[in-house]
Amino acid sequence: MEDLYKIRFKKLKELSLRHNNISDIKVLEYFKFEKLETLKLRHNNISDIGILEKVNFKNLKHLSLYDNKISDITVLEKVKFEKLEMLNLGGNILSDINILEKVNFKELKELYLDNNKIIDITVFWKTKFEKLEKLGLENNKLDKIRFAFLIIKLKLKIKEFTM
């Protein structure tokens, strides 16, 4: 395992591992992705994303975890993706997204949470996503009254909203 620390991808900007059978992404901790901007882990069997707090993806702009088995995103509070612009967590089994209140992705422009089990979206009253332009929440179990209030809050800030 110590040899893995020496592996560096000095120029790699995009890593796509879509449509595999990956369940454990802990190995990402051992690689140095100095210029990685896009990481695509769609359509796998990932349930634990805790390792994301240990990786150093200082240039990461796009992270897609669509269609996995993720139910817990509390690690996002500790993640240091200062340049992250797009986060896709759609197609998982998320129900509680209240941690988003504590997440500090200052550059986030697109957030996709579609195809989950989300009921309560009042957390968006408290989020700090000042640059958010697109929010995908379709195919969840949203409460209509809370949704109506959210739309009023987001109307002027977000360019595209899907439900």
Residue ranges and their predicted role:
Residues 1, 117, 141-145:
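Intrinsically disordered low-complexity regions specifically enriched for long asparagine
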